[in-house]
């Protein structure tokens, strides 16, 4: 059996991380790869398009009902979806109570003990990335995920989150084998978005793996709780996800140790590639009317 690839998709909330990851993994499955998805986002939406479900029961909620995680069996928590993709959601506590990362730690340990990673080509962790706290950094910290793919856009907060995630990778890169596989730009139609994403990737000592164009067919598929690969397999957008999947498949061993940048450097990038072609500190804090 080929060696197991453990990858993770990180990105700020609302960036389209779960949608991008599920479509990409569906494409990998179509290529004959055996996939296990481990959802590490408290929203528990990392598998809905694969399972055609609103939200999968999480390991933490099932453990609470059963008494403890030791009372669960693998078949209790794992569901099989499109292209035989196996799906698990770690879950998290009620809002305002406890650490959301606890579910990630509990779930990964349980899955390993139960042999969930056997006969698998890819394990994919779908992780919230606004805050790289200890729990959410678990796949990185414990040397589980070897390749991190950051879903971002040309918007400032998405880039800020990508830089923060890179800091988390850097912290554990030397003690473990984790590497930044690359950035995936989920287009938001901001000015000079492709150039900006490419420039940020270069600053982070990485590369832009793929620029995913915006297409309403993604939302049409989501309303039916389906990936584009299943909903419209011959569409141009399905082809984009297949291209992305191929690039990730060919990217084994090509990850890098990232070089995060400062906030000033990030703002400079935005000014160079965004709405303001010239960096002019005198314009900071002035309205559009005054600036004109």
Swiss-Prot record:
It comes from Herbaspirillum seropedicae. NCBIfam families: nifH. The keyword ATP-binding applies. Its cofactor is [4Fe-4S] cluster. This is Nitrogenase iron protein. It catalyses: N2 + 8 reduced [2Fe-2S]-[ferredoxin] + 16 ATP + 16 H2O = H2 + 8 oxidized [2Fe-2S]-[ferredoxin] + 2 NH4(+) + 16 ADP + 16 phosphate + 6 H(+). Belongs to the NifH/BchL/ChlL family. The reversible ADP-ribosylation of Arg-102 inactivates the nitrogenase reductase and regulates nitrogenase activity. GO terms for molecular function: 4 iron, 4 sulfur cluster binding; ATP binding; metal ion binding; nitrogenase activity. Its EC number is 1.18.6.1. The modification ADP-ribosylarginine is found at residue 102.
